[in-house]
Amino acid sequence: MNEVKPINLVGVTACPSGVAHTYMAAESLETAAKAAGCDVHVETQGQIGIENQLSTAAIKAADVVILTNDIGIKNEDRFKGKLVLRVSSGDLIGKSPIIVKKLMAKLAEV
Amino acid sequence: MEIVTKDIINLDLKTQDKNDAIRQLGQLLNKAGRLNNLEGYIQNVIKRETLTTTGIGFGIAIPHGKTDAVKDISVAIARLHEPIDWASLDGGKVDLIFQLAVPESSKGDEHLRLLSALSRNLIHEDFRNKIRTSQTAQEVIDLISQSLTKALEV
């Protein structure tokens, strides 16, 4: 088994009303990823509009893309060819530390 | 108008179930002159609740209504006398409610940034703990404004 190493993550979060879950999910993912030593960028698509838009470089460098599946994500074609994980914003809010750990373990197997 | 004021905070709300809690907080918002239509707002919040639960875990629920029944963007806060069921994502009971009221037409509103910053803060345990141990409504407001100021500076 290979060594589990920090990975590069990007994510996009959105939710039906776009006022709360979007931001909680983003914060939770960022906090968990940083705690695990990973590089992380999370774009929010809420009522305010798009914030922290992912750069082309960040997407290119990402080992995995995490998208919330509560509602559609805008400009999803940016992630063509990337490894994409779809989870609910609720799962990101509650389980980001576990999700990040599992992704790190999974990528170490490759 | 500020998004949270003392008159929409109840640090010892007595309630048995979530619909009653939503109604009581709706009444607080209405009394503070922040709604156009109390029933319309309550129905909107309860309808939102049926889409997916707003019990986000950590003992917190964030019911919200986005409707023209809301006049001013607001967050009513309640600490519950006894924790209640909220079909939470982590299965736990809820003892802290942040009930949002957002006008339908609030696109681009600066206040939405405050709500997003508050939502982000709720992810952090130390922030939740401080709200749980606050002695007065003013203390809660101070905590929130401090953290929001910090969040908006970054």
Question: What role is predicted for each listed range?
Answer:
Chain B
Residues 1-154:
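Cytosolic covalent-transfer regions centered on His/Cys nucleophiles
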